């Protein structure tokens, strides 16, 4: 999945708006983070902790949690390796969590 495809998908969800910079765009719903591009291959996504663990188990090559994020509702998606459907699923989880 490319950064442009991430943006197109995220912005297709109701209420999602793009913020950030050209190099590091971020997508928010109700001013709450859904996802943020760290670099062209790494996307940080807000995900509820129980769902994050399931995502990591199902897709260990495409997702990870660096030590600095372990206590947070976040996961990194490695866009060159992650299944596009799993990335969309994670974005959906973030959108559901943040729109409440």
Which functions belong to the PLM regions below?
Residues 1-100:
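Charge-dense, helix-prone N-terminal extensions
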